[in-house]
Amino acid sequence: MRFFTCVAFAACLASPGLAQPQTAGGSLPSPDELSSRDTLTVAVGGAILPDYDGSDDYRIVPVGAIRGRYHGISFDTSGTYLYVNLVPAHGKLTFEAGPVAGMRFDTRKDIEDHIVKLLPHRHRAVELGAFAGIGLHGLTNPYDTLSLRVDAAHDIGNAHKSTVVGTTLSFSTPVSRKTYVSASTGAEFVSNKFADYYYGISPADSLATGGVLPIFDADGGMKDWKASLLVNQSITGDLLGGLSIFGMGQYSHLVGDFRRSPIVADRGSASQWLGAVGLAYTW
């Protein structure tokens, strides 16, 4: 739902409950059998991403993610956020709902731009909220998923102290018993408090940069839109279990006052690219 210091790829990892067409032995479990199966996927890798949301400087960071299901309760991490779905999945039309919790690490520390670095550091945001979604299965084969998710989380810490709302539309399908692909698009909506905290330039901020960054009052609204693609390829076994390799790419574009903010328009770019590669293991 957000821009993360850890790239958000866990939500795109192959879901052992719904994404596999066939086991290594050749049998064909039903989608309901797969959706009731306890499973755990752990992924580690490396990602390249901007220094801050709107920067044109990039860095390489380690990333990790988990996704699983236990007794009908599923969970996954997306960047630094944990989603827990409390609604068991059965049938062609499924629903999801549950809590989401995480942290936003966009603090302006350890960035390359020498002008933006002069601005005051930002606190880490601690965000708690909830999400809900709907999924439709079996559009092109019995194991694909078209899903829509909406989430909202509020900062309970000492950062932007506001609510962030995100939407994600995704389509995921196996193309063989060893290969899985997922494409998604989404948008994020934030408040005036969020916009001012991360993208506004106060008179004191402008003075701290020697006037290089002009005073700017940022308004909230739609912050950005994004699109991503992930491919997961089994190395051992199949998508039901074993070792796999994944690669993903994401493009996002800042809009409105977020694009016009001096830290983006003058010192960065509205176009943001993220990429990650790594290994995953499914039990």
What are these regions (language model features)?
Residues 38-44, 64, 75, 95-99, ...:
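Transmembrane beta-strands of outer-membrane beta-barrel proteins
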Residues 1-36, 268:
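Cleavable N-terminal export/targeting peptides
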Residues 44-48, 64-70, 82-88, 130-136, ...:
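Residues on the lipid-exposed face of transmembrane beta-strands in outer-membrane beta-barrel proteins
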Residues 38, 58-64, 93, 122-128, ...:
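Residues that define the transmembrane beta-barrel architecture of outer-membrane proteins
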Residues 134, 156-244, 251-260, 264, ...:
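Outer-membrane beta-barrel transmembrane domain signature
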Residues 50-52, 84-85, 114-119, 152-156, ...:
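Extracellular loop and loop/strand-boundary signature of outer-membrane beta-barrel proteins
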Residues 23-38, 54, 73-95, 137-146, ...:
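Short loop/turn motifs that connect adjacent beta-strands in outer-membrane beta-barrel proteins
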Residues 42-50, 73-83, 113-117, 145-156:
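Transmembrane beta-strand segments that form the barrel wall of outer-membrane beta-barrel proteins
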